[in-house]
């Protein structure tokens, strides 16, 4: 009986270890090419931007668009909200509007690698 419990414990431990090792590979905690960005804690548009990020991750493009627009209204210089709005607009095939937002994000945060090195932003700005 003791040997069965030890075997089960070993299998469970290996399973947990495998899941933990795979976490970084599957995007857990890493940014993909079109990941929405959280805003800095000091931003007046933080709540709406971060709410928009949640909806964006769920594929609710139109709902996230509304939150990103509110965030920009609260803080017009919030580069992350402009970038995120560009992502949402791109998903809804509103490419001209998306390009405008990506350009604004790049203008506001020229040294932010999450924005300036974004493949989707580069694709739009090259259009």
Show where each model-derived region lies.
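Register position in tetratricopeptide repeats
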Residues: 57-58, 91-92, 124-127
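Canonical tetratricopeptide repeat
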Residues: 50, 84, 118-119
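Conserved structural position within tetratricopeptide repeats
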Residues: 70-73, 106-107
């Amino acid at each position: 009986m003791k040997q069965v419990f030890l075997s089960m414990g070993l299998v469970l431990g290996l399973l947990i270890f495998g899941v933990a090792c795979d976490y970084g590979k599957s995007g857990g905690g890493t940014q993909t090419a079109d990941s929405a960005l959280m805003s800095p804690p000091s931003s007046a548009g933080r709540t709406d931007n971060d709410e928009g990020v949640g909806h964006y991750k769920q594929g609710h493009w139109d709902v996230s668009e509304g939150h990103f627009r509110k965030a920009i209204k609260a803080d017009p210089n919030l580069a992350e909200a402009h970038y995120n709005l560009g992502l949402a607009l791109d998903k809804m095939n509103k490419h001209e509007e998306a390009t405008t937002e990506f350009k604004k994000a790049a203008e506001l945060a020229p040294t932010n690698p999450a924005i300036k090195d974004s493949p989707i932003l580069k694709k739009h700005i090259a259009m």
